[in-house]
Amino acid sequence: MSTEPGYASPVVNVASSLPRRAAASTVLIVPVVSTGDDDKPGAVVASAGSFLSSDAVAEIESGLRALAATGGAEQLHRLVVGSLPVSSVLTVGLGKPRSEWPADTVRRAAGVAARSLSNTETVFTTLAALPGEGVASAAVEGLILGSYRFTEFRSAKTAPKDKGLQKITVLATAKDAKQEVAHGAAVATAVATARDLVNTPPSHLFPDEFAKRARALGESVGLEVEVLDEKALQKGGYGGILGVGQGSSRPPRLVRLIHRGSRLAKKSKQAKKVALVGKGVTFDTGGISIKPAASMHHMTSDMGGAAAVIATVALAAQLQLPIDVIATVPMAENMPSGTAQRPGDVLTQYGGTTVEVQNTDAEGRLILADAIVRACEDNPDYLIETSTLTGAQTVALGARIPGVMGSDEFRDRVAAISQRVGENGWPMPLPDELKEDLKSTVADLSNISGQRFAGMLVAGVFLREFIADGVGWAHIDVAGPAYNTGSPWGYSPKGATGVPTRTMFAVLEDIAANG
């Protein structure tokens, strides 16, 4: 999907059996389960073993016995199995046996397996043969996302010596296997595109360049694209975007990407319209209210919401969802300088609301407010906004769980879908009394409250002020989940994760199917 240098997803196909003779550096990934007894070895899952001869299964289980491998969740063991036409077999543990497997269990197992591979160009897997809804798609997603690497800025001295995973063959015979596998590959590639954008350093991805990449990606899949430069923003009255960007020598942008999918619907007049909004602060120093230096370099990820939105709307066009999807993406760099906005300044948001800027490091909500008002002018049925908005999200929910706020019914719908796809968004309230803390003596609103507590919810309450009446909306705060500062886990690498791309696309699919 990406039109710029970055991660090239492996080629994915489906086969009903292993080849008679496989190429060198070929690995077969086989799921195994535990017996529940730590003294007994793991066993090959029966459905996954249906693609293997009884001799091959016996050889694998003999190897597990020799290694005292129990089949515990995400345990990996490499075996040489002479009766199979592959260089080696990689078993991945799933834990206790189940009659049906949750998709994210399979996705994580595939991701762990993929991350362990080196000098491996071709993978076969029987993971898709596991019983359970969506497991074939999940297996492919996990393999692609687990094998992700970002090497664009590495010289020959430090770049990986191998090519990385080039080809995935999914062993499956189900009627819809090819369709499910293709869907999983498309979704994972979109997530990889979002990761590439977030991992690109701010020296190379600033508002104008970000807008150019969004345009190139959008046009490559047939989206309508509109880019507003600083002059157009000034003329249009986008005070929030301009205020945040005025301290930088690299001026802000507003990008609009439009997928007109309703024309693909059987009943086009009944097709829903969805607005997507994503925070695109390409680097956030905090401005005059400057951040501590120790972790400021992580603020290369402060456009993670924008990256996910751009990848999502492009995927909607690529897979031709029969609904209208309109992405509105504000892009700015928040820098301290003689021209930067100051604490105490008052700016006028797009649409006329005035805001007192009490803290220049609460800048994301200022650019989002402009974008939300503009997005609501399109009269959407639903609006999904996502942003790396508050450190309070991580304090409240940790580094892996997004906070989901918004109108109650749609918030709960988005959170449930997020949990289903394994991104684990959690519904949070927006108490009305928090609005009192956003009162200003000189403007309509302040951009922060005077309280230490509930920072994630306060930001959501601020954004709610700009949502048009009657629009079902959700705000997904991914301050922690969008960027993994710790060790890799599951199918998540260190650095950009691409969250919440899969959540947003799954919500779009649900709206297309159910309204």
Swiss-Prot record:
- Organism equals Mycolicibacterium paratuberculosis (strain ATCC BAA-968 / K-10) (Mycobacterium paratuberculosis)
Which GO cellular component term is one of those annotated?
cytoplasm
Q: Does the keyword Cytoplasm apply?
A: yes
Q: Which cofactor does it need?
A: Mn(2+)
Q: Which Gene3D superfamilies match?
A: Leucine Aminopeptidase, subunit E, domain 1 (3.40.220.10), Zn peptidases (3.40.630.10)
EC code: 3.4.11.1, 3.4.11.10
Q: Which family does it belong to?
A: Belongs to the peptidase M17 family.
The domain of life is Bacteria
Q: Which HAMAP family match?
A: Cytosol_peptidase_M17
Which coarse location class applies to the principal site listed for this UniProt protein? cytoplasm
Does the UniProt entry include the keyword Metal-binding?
Answer: yes
Where is the protein localized?
Cytoplasm
Binding of Mn(2+) 1, residues: 284, 361, 363
- A Gene Ontology molecular-function term? metalloaminopeptidase activity
What remark does the entry make about the cofactor? Binds 2 manganese ions per subunit.
Tell me, in a sentence or two, what this protein's role is.
Presumably involved in the processing and regular turnover of intracellular proteins. Catalyzes the removal of unsubstituted N-terminal amino acids from various peptides.
Lineage of the organism:
Bacteria, Bacillati, Actinomycetota, Actinomycetes, Mycobacteriales
UniProt keyword list: Aminopeptidase, Cytoplasm, Hydrolase, Manganese, Metal-binding, Protease
Q: What is this protein called?
A: Probable cytosol aminopeptidase
From the UniProt record, list the reaction(s) this protein catalyses: Release of an N-terminal amino acid, Xaa-|-Yaa-, in which Xaa is preferably Leu, but may be other amino acids including Pro although not Arg or Lys, and Yaa may be Pro. Amino acid amides and methyl esters are also readily hydrolyzed, but rates on arylamides are exceedingly low; Release of an N-terminal amino acid, preferentially leucine, but not glutamic or aspartic acids
Q: Which residues bind Mn(2+) 2?
A: 279, 284, 302, 363
Question: Which BP terms in the Gene Ontology apply to this protein?
Answer: proteolysis
Gene (name only)? pepA
- Give the main EC class: hydrolase
Which residues participate directly in catalysis? 291, 365
